[in-house]
């Protein structure tokens, strides 16, 4: 999003002051929504931040502290408003791993009770993967996750210093992970949803980490998507701000993501059917990567314009193992 010039901001502030003085601030101007996107090392992850002119609210922390610090630096270059809170949309590492950076600034962290409760288990699972399997980190270099400071259940309204409000909604369905918060900018109806939506971008198909196991819930993901239009009711121009990809109007974003998930599941089902007796190879660490790559190729072929096809290869194991589970019982 293009940043206004200082001259324009000054004019807007003067206008807002006049309005506040003559109309008792009943028509306060909306703040500004910004998006920071990490580099490839951070998986091209979006963090959305909202500046109401008096304070900044950040949604999702990024994967490692160095990238979170780059986010903070970007914010501080663009506004003098202090960062006062960081909201976690769901329990995935790129949403909570770098909370420490924001806590050091005095910002308060917020997540649903369910998301906060899930974080330790997800952290243990991912820490083991990145240190012991991927060997991309050591125990010392992998982010030390700090606890969420404030929790809520169901819904919560946050009144900003400007008088504007943000609404938090805990979806009834699990969504992309085991629990999902949607942050609504109440002035505009824009919805910030983390990886629940990746418009024009491939999805993360691992599922939530539950009891130490990847547990995708495609029906629950689609059900979560169906909840979004009602949250933006009365705001026909509202967009969905997902964890990666582009930002589309709510109806379009929901339809596109739902169609993608349906196709992804169909591709996996078809591949497993053709694989036949070789399905056991999907449980063999030495052989499964070839199959994951083949599924990635099929899904990438179905969506040739979508970015980040590698996300499929990294994450589809969760969906594959879920599909295989009934046959193994």
Regions found by a protein language model. Give the residues of each.
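Gram-negative bacterial Sec-dependent N-terminal signal peptides
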Residues: 1-29
């Amino acid at each position: 999003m293009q940043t206004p010039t200082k001259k324009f901001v000054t004019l807007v502030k003067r206008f807002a002051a006049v309005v506040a003085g003559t109309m008792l601030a009943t028509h306060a101007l909306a703040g500004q929504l910004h998006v920071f996107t990490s580099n490839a090392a951070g998986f091209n992850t979006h963090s959305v931040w909202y500046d109401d002119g008096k304070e900044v609210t950040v949604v999702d922390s990024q994967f490692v502290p160095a990238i979170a610090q780059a986010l903070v630096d970007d914010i501080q270059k663009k506004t003098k408003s202090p960062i006062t809170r960081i909201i976690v949309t769901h329990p995935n590492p790129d949403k909570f791993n770098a909370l420490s950076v924001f806590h050091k600034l005095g910002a308060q962290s917020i997540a649903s009770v369910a998301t906060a409760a899930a974080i330790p288990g997800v952290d243990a699972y991912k820490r083991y993967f990145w240190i012991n399997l991927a060997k991309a980190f050591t125990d010392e270099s992998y982010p030390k996750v700090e606890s969420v400071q404030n929790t809520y259940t169901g819904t919560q309204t946050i009144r900003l210093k400007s008088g504007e409000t943000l609404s938090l909604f805990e979806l009834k369905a699990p969504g992309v992970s085991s629990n999902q918060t949607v942050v609504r900018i109440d002035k505009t109806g824009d919805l910030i949803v983390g990886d629940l939506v990746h418009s024009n971008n491939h999805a993360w198909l691992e599922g939530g980490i539950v009891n130490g196991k990847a547990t995708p819930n495609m029906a629950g993901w689609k059900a979560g998507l169906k909840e979004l239009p009602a949250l933006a009711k009365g705001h026909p121009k509202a967009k969905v701000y997902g964890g990666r990809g582009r930002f589309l109007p709510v109806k379009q974003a929901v339809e596109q993501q739902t169609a993608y998930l349906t196709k992804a599941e169909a591709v996996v089902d078809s591949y497993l059917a053709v694989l036949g007796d070789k399905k056991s190879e999907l449980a063999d660490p030495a052989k499964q990567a070839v199959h994951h790559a083949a599924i990635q190729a099929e899904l990438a072929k179905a969506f040739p314009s979508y970015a980040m096809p590698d996300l499929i290869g990294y994450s589809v194991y969760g969906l594959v193992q879920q599909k295989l589970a009934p046959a193994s019982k």
